[in-house]
């Protein structure tokens, strides 16, 4: 029996991505061929598929939960915001164009065809598809031409469950109100509710559950407990949980740009118990770090200007004068060069921006985006380790032949630079910290000589298994699939 199920939420960050990942693992454990699907995702955290396409990072993690490789059809529409009112539109893994919100609203009728094409392809290949909605289905202003929530569910004729986060408060108002704002046909599609992140005695919640079921005629499929210490890659929001301790072996600071991208790069550092890790926000200081890492950016020149507006450029130069280490990834790497040129206006107004000058490097932004998974070797301080990652960038950087590139890729090409003073390191590789030995080598280069390796992939697997175990224990899945 085919199993299609869509998880929608009362709000953003209600737990949709994690619940879908857990359901994928539950079904995969039973030998069911399952895959994830998200019709439309708006996020700056993305992943590269084996065939060189770009999808939301959450769907790549959900594919991992299924034990399969990610595909562009698992997230056929990806929106990557590049301003407050516009985004780059990516269809089935390939960049289409930049669109303002009004233009994209009109385009959604066309985008729905792409969404349905991908979904139908997956239906032919898999026994089960766990579908993730976006935000809330009850956003009145977004319901016209909706392709992300009930608009898709109606078109594809799939059942829906609605999840809400009780830890935020107001869970019954969220669930009852969301259902009430749906049309009759949409309400009929809802098979039940899931309450997420509950702390305390479940008996004290029972009267509320009974009221909700009586008022809506829908069952509460289950109540998932608050999982202390749980961490799985965030879809887009910066993780609120920092890893602060005065006795850690390495202190890492990452400035949060206005268009920061792929901040999941830092999860292997943020979750490493040996590292004092912090994100540095507006009005905060970078001081006190051993290693400052400039992250990726969807708008490199704009974020370079933002960096200067915060005074972080002066703090970085002072950090270097005092012997500290600085690293840049992708857009952050470009910022560490001498100039970033945008003659075609790829990221906005055409022009050039002066970089921080740590590397004798020029970057020109181009219309062609490089999307690829890579492997190779990294050499720092004379020690070589295996390295891997993925590239997602529109810029091309050039530097003099006598500059030192620390990464040799499997095709013989070079990536990144190390400064002559050995205090700066830049690379285009997202995910460079995912391999334990690579992260360890970089941390040792930054001064943490006694630090231990941290296996982030293994930690991810434990997190996926943990949410799957909670689903098995606390959700009545036979309400969804009697034959399971």
Swiss-Prot record:
PROSITE patterns: GATASE_COBBQ. Pfam families: CbiA (PF01656), GATase_3 (PF07685). Residues 249-438 form the GATase cobBQ-type domain. Pathway: Cofactor biosynthesis; adenosylcobalamin biosynthesis. GO terms for molecular function: ABC-type vitamin B12 transporter activity; catalytic activity. The keyword Ribosomal protein does not apply. This is Cobyric acid synthase. The gene is cobQ.
């Amino acid at each position: 029996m085919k199993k299609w199920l869509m998880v929608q939420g009362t709000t953003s960050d209600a737990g949709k991505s994690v619940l879908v990942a857990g359901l994928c693992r539950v079904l995969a454990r039973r030998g069911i061929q399952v895959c994830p699907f998200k019709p439309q995702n708006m996020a700056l955290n993305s992943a590269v598929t084996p065939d060189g396409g770009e999808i939301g990072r959450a769907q790549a993690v959900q594919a991992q939960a299924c034990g399969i490789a990610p595909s562009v059809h698992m997230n056929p529409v990806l929106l990557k915001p590049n301003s407050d009112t516009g985004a780059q539109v990516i269809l089935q893994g390939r960049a289409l164009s930049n669109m303002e919100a009004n233009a994209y609203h009109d385009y959604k009728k066309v985008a729905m065809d792409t969404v349905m094409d991908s979904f139908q392809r997956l239906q032919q290949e898999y026994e089960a598809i766990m579908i993730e909605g976006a935000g809330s289905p009850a956003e009145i202003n977004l319901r016209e031409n909706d392709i992300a929530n009930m608009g898709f569910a109606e078109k594809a004729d799939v059942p829906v469950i609605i999840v809400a986060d009780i830890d935020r408060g107001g869970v019954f108002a969220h669930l009852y109100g969301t259902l009430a704002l749906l049309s009759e046909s949409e309400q009929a599609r809802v098979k039940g509710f899931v309450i997420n992140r509950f702390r305390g005695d479940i008996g004290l919640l029972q009267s509320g559950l009974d009221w909700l079921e009586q008022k809506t005629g829908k069952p509460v499929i289950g109540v998932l407990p608050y999982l202390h210490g749980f961490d799985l890659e965030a879809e887009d929001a910066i993780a609120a949980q920092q890893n602060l301790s005065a006795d850690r072996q390495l202190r890492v600071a990452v400035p949060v740009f206005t268009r920061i991208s792929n901040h999941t790069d830092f999860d292997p550092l943020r979750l490493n118990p040996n590292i004092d890790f912090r994100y540095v926000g507006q009005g905060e200081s970078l001081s006190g770090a051993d290693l400052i890492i400039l992250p990726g950016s969807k708008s490199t020149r704009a974020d370079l200007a933002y960096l200067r507006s915060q005074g972080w450029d002066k703090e970085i130069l002072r950090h270097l004068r005092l012997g500290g280490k600085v690293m840049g990834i992708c857009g952050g790497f470009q910022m560490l060069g001498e100039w970033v040129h945008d003659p075609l206006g790829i990221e906005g107004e055409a022009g050039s921006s002066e970089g921080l000058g740590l590397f004798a490097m020029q970057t020109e932004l181009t219309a062609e985006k490089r999307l690829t998974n890579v492997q190779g070797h990294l050499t720092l301080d004379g020690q070589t380790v295996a390295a891997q990652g993925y590239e997602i960038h529109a810029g091309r950087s050039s530097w003099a032949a006598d500059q030192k590139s620390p990464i040799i890729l499997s095709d013989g090409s070079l990536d990144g630079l190390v400064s002559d003073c050995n205090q700066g390191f830049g690379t285009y590789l997202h995910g460079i910290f995912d391999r334990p030995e690579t992260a360890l080598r970089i941390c040792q280069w930054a001064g943490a000589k006694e630090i231990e390796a941290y296996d982030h992939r293994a930690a991810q697997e434990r997190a996926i298994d943990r949410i799957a175990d909670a689903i098995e224990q606390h959700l009545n899945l036979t309400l969804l699939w009697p034959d399971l």
